[in-house]
């Protein structure tokens, strides 16, 4: 029901007013928005909340409304004085609170309509107010009900969204004021009602503008964005306040870095300190960039970190230089590292001199003369180190300031040589290096008078002569020209490294592993002076002087023993003293002269074929080698460390690589394949001895024991294949003891009853029979048949076929124990078995040859499979184990052929 209808009913029935009052009291308990009217000063709040442009209009309208309301209240009191007294008590308590719910709902709809009309349609209020504009009678019940229903329908959807929001104080006060005015004049016209609604809407609109400032700021309007900028500016100013003017000046001088990098750097340093970690500095940053890096951090420079921590951090960052960064720039040893290297070298010299005084020599004259040359060279080296130490420190410091490169990572004199040898890199640009001073004494450099060297006879050798030679390798002469300016080191750095080189490089010079040898060669490329090649006299005299020829190095002549000896690089001075004692017992007239720098080179040179000349010049290193002729070596390709099945060395003989692969399952087949290739290329050279894999006695010559049961001259054979099959069976010994051959077949590695090497022995026998003039087997055309390569290949096929047929037969029949006692009654049965075996082999060979002549290439595979299935003697289950081996053989052959085509074509 509408509010006006309830008002009319309450006027007629006084008891109904009491009931309305009770209901309003209950509404006040459960619905707090129904609060009693309280006098509120609207003008002051409106003036505070409204913007300055709208204050005058709003104040004028409120004054006009208040005047109208007073006039209405006075006229109403004059008309009904008696009823007013009785009604005021009820109206003040019940009517304002009761009528607040529909009017507040209508008022809230007015609020929404006014705010929406500003953006959508200007004529919307006129359309909504036209039904109320035509009301002339205030107490017309029909029109009141229609108007109230229209208002309720129009505001019902909007009422739910605004019930959850708390109404502002200014809007609530304006609503209560309108309620009081409506209670005083319930009989006003519709025009006055519309004017009151417009005034209330203006009040509400003004207060909404004042209240919604926070909501507009949250929604992201321009006013909110402007207000949000101020605290951000204050935060920036606060962060700027931490920076000192000194830091700002330094920051202006250095190039600015991004703000994200500074924030990340400062936060990472704080976290690293809290976790006990250290920050690793960039290798490419200079020292000035490293100091200016702290300009962006909010902390002052004095509180960054103590000097001891900075020093330890710099040392850690130097130690953590990666290998890729070290390969880009040449690394110079630090001045303090050079000082330490010199001091340690002095102690080594003193220790060597002390130990040399305690030694006793059997041949004092020559040994002491050699030791005297050693000590003179060491003293000269020490003097040069002392003289160049000061210059070296100045040059290295100036070089570090120019290039701002990180300091070398060598922390001990023993590691100084390794670091210097690692960083020397090659470059593609050929640049001629500056000539090095001749007086710098380093390994492999001639020190001493040339007259003393010329007095040495060529027939004798100086044992324990460590004076280096003026010779230079070919590869080093070529590689010194191809060094870039980055790899050219200063003279002072070379002289400073000489102290540590003489200590650690003395024992490393002749026993270096293959992995560290290229690094040492890179260091020697710069330490050796460029000597002209046109000095054959000096070089010949230098070749006659030997290195330290200890018994350990004497064994390096044997290539197999070199693979088993470990490197002896850890003993520096002890190895020299041990070599002194051992060399005193070596005869000086020996003709063996070995001059190689490592075992790796000796192994590599052993792969080349031996020449007839006693001396051979190595094509890689340009040095002379005098080696006794041990045995003729086969020309093989050097095999890399990871052994591959594609290498030719894998099949022929053991690899010279330190990693050796021993193949057991394919040893005989590989030996057969290698020998077969040589035999096919040279069909007439059958005089080569063939090794048997089962025997360890070495190669065997063709013996007459294999041919004691040779076929008779007048024997009847249908074809030459039958005769050759009988020769195979007699030479292999299968016919002599068939049962024992079946047992030995089970124990054989290759799973074949006949050794594949027997074929070459048979061919050697045939070749020898051809040369004999009185041979009983020689007839018409026999010589041409034996020397024809086609016949040789045919015999090879027959031999392999017989071997496979025997393997299948023995596998199918199984293993039988040999008879230990010869029974004469069983001899006929034994002979019959042998004859039966021979007939089976001959018939199988004939069948295969007949099928081969009638076969068609298109149906070749199907015919072969069908014939194999029809053969009753074949058992496919027994040959399942050979399938992986066959597949591996085929794959290896295919891959080897492909690699050969790619590499050599």
From Swiss-Prot:
GO BP terms in the entry: regulation of monopolar cell growth; unidimensional cell growth
Molecular function via GO: microtubule binding
Family annotation (InterPro entries): DUF4378, LNG1/2
Organism: Arabidopsis thaliana
Keyword Translocase on entry: no
Compositional bias segments (type: Polar residues): 432-461, 477-487, 501-516
Protein's name in the database: Protein LONGIFOLIA 2
Biased composition annotated in UniProt, kind: Basic and acidic residues: 65-74, 286-296, 566-581
Keyword Cytoplasm: yes
UniProt region (Disordered), positions on chain: 42-136, 232-268, 285-315, 432-585, 606-626, 690-711
Source superkingdom: Eukaryota
Main function: In association with LNG1, regulates leaf morphology by promoting longitudinal polar cell elongation independently of ROT3. Associates with microtubules and recruits TON1A and TON1B to the cytoskeleton through its C-terminus.
Bias kind Low complexity: ranges: 90-117
Main location class: cytoplasm
Sorted UniProt keywords: Cytoplasm, Cytoskeleton
Annotated knockout phenotype: No visible phenotype under normal growth conditions, but the lng1 and lng2 double mutant shows reduced length of cotyledons, rosette leaves, siliques and flowers.
Subunit organization: Interacts (via C-terminus) with TON1A and TON1B.
CC per GO annotation: cytoskeleton; cytosol
Locations listed in the record: Cytoplasm, Cytoskeleton
């Amino acid at each position: 029901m509408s509010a006006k209808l309830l008002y009319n009913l309450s006027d007629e029935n006084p008891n109904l007013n009491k009931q309305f009052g009770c209901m309003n009291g209950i509404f006040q308990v459960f619905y707090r928005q129904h609060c009693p009217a309280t006098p509120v000063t609207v003008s002051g709040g409106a003036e505070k909340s409204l913007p300055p442009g709208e204050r005058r209009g709003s104040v004028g309208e409120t004054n006009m409304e208040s005047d109208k309301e007073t006039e209405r209240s006075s006229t109403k009191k004059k008309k009904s004085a008696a009823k007013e007294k009785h009604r005021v008590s009820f109206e003040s308590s019940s009517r304002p609170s009761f009528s607040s719910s529909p009017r507040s709902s209508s008022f809230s709809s007015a609020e929404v309509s006014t705010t929406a009309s500003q953006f959508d349609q200007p004529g919307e209020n006129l359309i909504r107010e036209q039904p109320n504009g035509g009301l002339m009678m205030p107490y017309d019940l029909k029109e009141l009900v229609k108007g109230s229903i229209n208002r309720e329908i129009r505001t019902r959807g909007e009422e739910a969204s605004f019930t959850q929001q708390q109404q502002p104080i200014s809007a609530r006060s304006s609503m209560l004021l309108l309620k009081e005015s409506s209670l005083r004049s319930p009989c006003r016209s519709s025009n006055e009602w519309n004017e009151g609604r417009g005034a209330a809407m203006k009040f509400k609109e003004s207060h909404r503008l004042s209240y919604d400032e926070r909501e507009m700021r949250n929604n992201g309007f321009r006013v909110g964005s402007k207000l949000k900028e101020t605290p951000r500016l204050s935060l920036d100013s606060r962060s700027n306040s931490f920076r000192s003017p000194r830091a700002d000046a330094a920051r202006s001088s250095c190039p600015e870095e991004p703000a994200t990098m500074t924030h990340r750097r400062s936060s990472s340093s704080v976290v690293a300190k809290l976790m006990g970690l250290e920050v690793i500095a960039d290798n490419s940053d200079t020292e000035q960039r490293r100091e200016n890096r702290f300009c962006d951090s909010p902390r002052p420079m004095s509180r960054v970190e103590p000097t001891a921590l900075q020093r330890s951090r710099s040392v850690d960052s130097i130690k953590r230089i990666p290998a890729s960064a070290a390969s880009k720039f040449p690394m110079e040893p630090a001045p303090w590292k050079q000082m330490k290297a010199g001091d340690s070298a002095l102690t080594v010299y003193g220790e060597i001199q002390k130990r040399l005084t305690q030694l006793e020599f059997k041949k004092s004259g020559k040994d002491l003369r050699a030791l005297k040359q050693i000590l003179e060279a060491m003293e000269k080296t020490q003097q040069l180190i002392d003289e160049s130490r000061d210059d070296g420190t100045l040059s290295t410091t100036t070089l570090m300031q120019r290039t701002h490169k990180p300091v070398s990572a060598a922390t001990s004199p023993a590691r100084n040589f390794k670091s210097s040898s690692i960083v020397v890199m090659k470059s593609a640009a050929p640049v001629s290096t500056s000539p090095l001073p001749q007086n710098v004494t380093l390994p492999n450099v001639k020190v001493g008078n040339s007259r003393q060297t010329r007095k040495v006879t060529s027939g004798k050798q100086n044992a324990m002569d460590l004076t280096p030679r003026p010779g230079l390798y070919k590869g080093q002469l070529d590689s010194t020209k191809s060094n870039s300016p980055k790899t050219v080191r200063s003279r002072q750095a070379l002289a400073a490294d000489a102290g540590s080189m003489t200590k650690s490089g003395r024992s490393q010079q002749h026993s270096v592993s293959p992995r560290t040898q290229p690094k040492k060669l890179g260091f020697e490329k710069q330490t050796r002076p460029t000597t002209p090649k046109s000095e054959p006299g000096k070089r010949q005299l230098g070749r006659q002087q030997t290195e330290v020829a200890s018994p350990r190095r004497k064994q390096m002549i044997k290539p197999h023993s070199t693979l088993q000896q470990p490197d002896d690089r850890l003993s520096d001075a002890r190895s020299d003293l041990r070599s002194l004692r051992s060399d005193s017992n070596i005869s000086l007239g020996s003709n063996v002269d070995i001059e190689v720098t490592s075992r790796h080179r000796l192994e590599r040179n052993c792969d080349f074929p031996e020449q007839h000349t006693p001396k051979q010049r190595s094509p890689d290193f340009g040095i002379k080698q005098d080696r006794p002729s041990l045995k003729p070596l086969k020309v093989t390709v050097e095999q890399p460390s990871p052994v591959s099945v594609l290498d030719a060395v894998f099949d022929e003989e053991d690899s010279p690589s330190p990693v050796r692969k021993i193949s057991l399952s394919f040893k005989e087949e590989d030996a057969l394949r290698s020998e077969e290739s040589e035999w096919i290329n040279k069909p007439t050279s059958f005089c080569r001895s063939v090794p048997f894999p089962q025997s360890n006695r070495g190669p065997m010559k063709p013996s007459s024991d294999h041919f004691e049961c040779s076929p008779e001259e007048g024997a009847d054979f249908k074809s030459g294949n039958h005769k050759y099959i009988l020769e195979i069976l007699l030479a292999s010994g299968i016919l002599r003891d068939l049962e024992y051959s079946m047992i030995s077949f089970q124990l054989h590695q290759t799973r074949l009853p006949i050794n594949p090497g027997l074929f070459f022995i048979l061919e050697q026998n045939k070749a020898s029979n051809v040369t004999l003039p009185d041979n009983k087997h020689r007839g018409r055309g026999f010589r041409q048949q034996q020397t024809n390569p086609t016949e040789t290949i045919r015999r090879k096929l027959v031999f392999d076929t017989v071997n496979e047929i025997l393997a299948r037969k023995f596998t199918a029949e199984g293993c039988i124990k040999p008879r230990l006692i010869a029974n004469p009654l069983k001899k006929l049965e034994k002979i019959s078995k042998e004859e039966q075996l021979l007939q089976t082999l001959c018939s199988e060979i004939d069948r295969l040859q007949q099928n081969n002549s009638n076969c068609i290439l298109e149906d070749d595979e199907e015919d072969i499979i069908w014939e194999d299935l029809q053969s009753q003697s074949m058992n496919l289950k027994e040959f399942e184990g050979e399938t992986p081996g066959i597949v591996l053989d085929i794959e290896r052959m295919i891959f080897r052929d492909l690699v050969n085509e790619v590499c050599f074509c």
